[in-house]
């Protein structure tokens, strides 16, 4: 972090059923601790866990996301913007169509490496023998599992067919789907509802920035994190 000049990292937290008023934590990170690049993730837990989010929590969460979006616009107008990871949205130079379909690429484009050299699709699968891909010495030996993760894309999930946000989440997180449905190709519906709300807020902020010159002037701009092909995201086809 020091080598990057104190940039390029996120202060990340997790909210549960016990703290659905998560903006309090985010504003504490920003106002009291001085962090400007923030993220707050909803917990994914067994339905019988006391920490698990419930359907009754959703209206409160939606209010929190709207509160956060409006407060971010206020801060931006004051020249003191903060970044919320899930509101980063570039409508002109977004991910290429390949990334919009395939998502994070867990198990195929990247893997988690444990301290003892084992390979897993991502950190959320570490320790589960059924999801061990191989090791750093022998490489990927469980090719059947790797091929199964290749199918983790937006078109492999029938429930995604009519969702307006499907090309922004690419079908969602395989680990979350497994924990919620028992299948990496399943659909974590609760997570879908939360994701769509975040997208609505991100789009609202984009509209506000275009309508208000002050907001546009102080907008935070992001560079693409993909250097594979150089194509413009929304229309380009990845050549990797």
Predicted regions and their residues:
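Radical SAM enzyme [4Fe-4S]-AdoMet core and its adjacent flexible, acidic
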Residues: 3-110, 128-132
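Flexible mid-to-C-terminal extensions adjoining Fe-S/redox cofactors in radical SAM and related proteins
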Residues: 126-240
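Short, acidic, Ser/Thr-enriched surface-loop or helix-capping motifs
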Residues: 114
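Proteins with a high burden of low-complexity, intrinsically disordered sequence enriched in S/T/G/P/A and R
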Residues: 1-5, 28-32, 172, 230-237
């Amino acid at each position: 972090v020091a080598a990057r000049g104190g940039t390029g990292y996120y202060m990340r937290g997790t909210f549960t059923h016990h703290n659905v008023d998560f903006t309090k934590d985010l504003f504490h990170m920003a106002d009291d601790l001085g962090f400007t690049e923030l993220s707050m993730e909803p917990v994914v837990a067994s339905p019988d866990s006391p920490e698990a989010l419930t359907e009754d929590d959703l209206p409160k969460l939606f209010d929190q996301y709207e509160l956060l979006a409006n407060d971010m616009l206020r801060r931006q107008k004051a020249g003191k913007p903060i970044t919320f990871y899930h509101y980063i949205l570039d409508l002109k130079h977004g991910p290429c169509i390949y990334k919009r379909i395939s998502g994070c690429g867990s198990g195929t484009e990247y893997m988690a490496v444990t301290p003892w050299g084992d390979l897993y699709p991502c950190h959320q699968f570490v320790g589960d023998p059924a999801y061990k891909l191989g090791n750093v010495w022998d490489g990927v030996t469980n090719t059947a599992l790797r091929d199964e993760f290749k199918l983790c894309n937006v078109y492999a999930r029938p429930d995604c067919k009519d969702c307006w946000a499907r090309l922004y989440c690419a079908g969602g997180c395989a680990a979350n789907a497994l924990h919620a449905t028992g299948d990496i190709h399943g659909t974590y519906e609760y997570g879908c509802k939360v994701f769509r709300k975040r997208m609505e807020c991100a789009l609202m902020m984009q509209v506000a920035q275009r309508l208000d010159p002050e907001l546009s002037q102080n907008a935070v701009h992001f560079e693409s994190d993909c250097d594979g092909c150089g194509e413009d995201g929304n229309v380009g086809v990845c050549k990797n």
